[in-house]
Amino acid sequence: MKKLTILILLAMAVVCRASAQNRVVTGTVSEEDGTPLTGAVVQVVGTNNAATAAIDGLYTLKNVPSGAVLRVSFLGYDPVEKKVDADRMDFILKASAQEIASVVVTGMQKMDKRIFTGATDQLLASDVKLDGISEISRGLEGRSAGVSVQNVSGTFGAAPKIRIRGATSIFGDSKPLWVVDGVIMEDVINVDANSLSSGDATTLISSAIAGLNADDIESFQILKDGSATSIYGARAMAGVIVITTKKGTPGITKVSYTGEFTMRMVPSYSNFNIMNSQEQMAVYQEMYDKGWLNYANTVYRSESGVYGKLSQLINTYDPATGQFAVLNTPEGRNAYLRQAEFRNTDWFKELFRNSIQHSHSASISSGSEKGSYYASVGAMVDPGWSIQSKVNRYTLLVNTTQHILKDKLTLNLIGNASYREQRAPGSLSSEVDPVFGTVKRDFDINPYSYALRSSRTLDPDEFYTRNYTPFNIKDELSKNYMDLNVSDVKFQAELKWKITPKVEVSALGAIKYQASSTEHHIEDSSNQAQAYRSMATSIIQSNNPYLYDNPDEPNRDKYSILPQGGIYKRSDFRAKSRDFRASISYNDTFNDKHILNLFGIVEVNAIDRRATSFQGWGLQYDMGETP
């Protein structure tokens, strides 16, 4: 019994001693005028034990040892440290000389906005991001004065036309320079601003930041005027957009997941002023009555629809029935045309589908006095709005900061990578007519353009005529398509040494590798492949522009350069860039009024771009793409 009593008393003594050593500290964090500082971090110095001030500035910190030191910090305010001497401790923070709203991030340094002589805007990523838009650069439209954003294509990977200072050059580029975490983002292929609206295949890899996850971006800094050229040289004559990615917060461990699901509905003709099939047939009938349409001429045209098909069927004999496909009588012709009149094909429903694009992002961040880290992975899956189109993108970002000698020596390591696989309808480069100034594209099968421009009298399952050969848009999309693969990896390290409170030197090194490949498959029975060998009659043979007319043999008829098989085109682009920068800065304030800022820098950049291409004509797709 005595032994049990001694054990109980000993246990009570241990509990009392533990209670005396650890306590719960509560209090408030506010400004000098009493305004609560929501989000201020209260941390036990030397540990990961921390709490965040609530909306009223109140905080509660548990397991605080007696005699410990609390450190309170908040962006834009000078940190405060106090020794724990009571269960309630209130903190009042003073605004620092450089508040966050007054700091300009140029990509090379952070400086007081009061001494920055250029025109600039700072935007938070949360204000720019648009739901359902995977590429965050499109959200800059209307967010900053003088910044014009023109979304020339809805296809993922195609960069929008961005103008910060208007048209800065007649023949040169007018697109801004992108800088991410102090490193210039080089394009894997240089596409000028005018070519962005061309619809060429290269525009799908024209965006410098398509590999960035929008959830990993903290803020944008837009440098608008000529001061940007003093920092980045002539390449910045069209402005600079500086992106800062997220970092870990000391004292707070945060795990987050973001899922976004976007449903895109099939477009509707009700949004466009387009005639229905009955109205179109009325126009065709008027053209026929006035002699603009006749059956004989439509048979040999390079492109024809209902009337061309009617001419073919009138001359198509079916031995099984002993009759022609369409009787060449007023009744027979009118019966066929009446079907087209009331067909009213909805090309949007034929070529588009209701789809759900979903993106997922998971991140973890934490930190202490010794350092912080932020890591995230992301995936975007787009099954495609139109047939024969889809995109999958995967991203990775790791951002760590280590304080080697407290606040004197800091090492920042950033690594990010992305991979994208994409399928899109086949497309050729556009051509400009130098005489008339018109732009044309051969074998254009863009689903959206086709739905807007094609007659609604056409049967979606029938083959009509284009390029002197049978054509059906759904069949062509399945046999004429492009596969793209884009990947990029970047690693950078920055070392900052604060020699004195006023003098700081830094060195940054970065290496980035980008690779993209585009494979254009044009199968044997596609309209494009057959156009190069269409010469059913002498009239078609003499008029088909895709047949070869040998200038050395003027008396010879045109002939095919693709008598059989299909076409395979592949383009590979590689870009390897290296950056090194060393700088020294001096900042001082005299009498709380005068600010002196000196900054010196030396920078070396190098980029190696390589492009290879291959074209294979006559490949047998049904035999494993063999010649």
Model segments located where?
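Short, small/polar-rich motifs associated with maturation and membrane association
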Residues: 1-7, 12-398, 403-404, 409-416, ...
